[in-house]
Amino acid sequence: MFKENTIKLGIAPIAWTNDDMPELGAENTFEQCISEMALAGFNGSEVGNKYPRNTVVLKKSLELRNLEIASAWFSAFLTTKPLEETVQAFIKHRDFLHDMGAKVIVVSEQGHSIQGLMDVPLFKNKPVFTEEEWEKLADGLHHLGKLAQEKGLHIVYHHHMGTGVQTTAEIEKLMDMTDPELVSLLFDTGHLVFSGEEPLYILKKYLSRIKHVHLKDIRQEVVDAVKESDLSFLQAVKNGAFTVPGDGVIVFDEVFTILANSDYKGWFVVEAEQDPALANPFEYALKARKFIQEKAGL
């Protein structure tokens, strides 16, 4: 289905230890995490809180297991803080990823975000940017995009639950306001379906701008309960809203077909944060790997 040597398969460490709720999977070590990733058949990963920031140490640990770094999340605060604060943190992040050989930087605007707040209802309190904030976001992303390109990297914007860029209309507005040469898109199946969007619409419309893919599935009954009970994003994660591809309600066949018939070249990263005490990370990594092999031939 996919052309040879176009796709690398990664998996996110958030299934082993949750970055937002470090008590979930606190017992899982960095070495266990990356060893199980390799054993499950993945080529690389994104970066978690337990990963060493010393690139010499990190490279050695990964090379022993034939793993690479695909990318790492960056929290921008372009709508709420002075640009220089985000820029300083971004340059450090960019240089780390460049040293690790990554080609994309995952960026998410966290100004007004409620994704990390345990008791704030996800759907009732979703932030909405003002026009002035949209302008700050677009201008700031252009700045970050230029900084990334100085080192041969691209920024990929992560639409995300509980943030100001979550819905179809918000993704479209961001894409309309930004330069395709400077700002690319991260396509995340799980966040789109969770929000009630149509992922194939976004995939088809912005195919040429998508430079990174997160594969995650949704347990619809949990999403329904989140809406009915006014739960937060973190409560949704703890209750199992997300799972690995093939374990929920999302149909991935057309997603894979569209991407296979496109010029997409890069990473598919399985990112399915759930409580590792309830969903053994190694077991679910194996499930995901088997599903991708069966459905995408990868």
Swiss-Prot record:
Its EC number is 4.2.1.44. Belongs to the IolE/MocC family. Gene3D superfamilies: Divalent-metal-dependent TIM barrel enzymes. InterPro entries: IolE, IolE/MocC, IolE/XylAMocC-like, Xyl_isomerase-like_sf, Xyl_isomerase-like_TIM-brl. It comes from the Bacteria. It catalyses: scyllo-inosose = 3D-3,5/4-trihydroxycyclohexane-1,2-dione + H2O. The keyword NAD does not apply. One of its GO terms (molecular function) is manganese ion binding. Pathway: Polyol metabolism; myo-inositol degradation into acetyl-CoA; acetyl-CoA from myo-inositol: step 2/7. The keyword Manganese applies. This is Inosose dehydratase 2. Pfam families: AP_endonuc_2. It comes from Bacillus cereus (strain ZK / E33L). Its cofactor is glutathione; Co(2+); Mn(2+). Keywords: Cobalt, Lyase, Manganese, Plasmid. GO terms for biological process: inositol catabolic process.
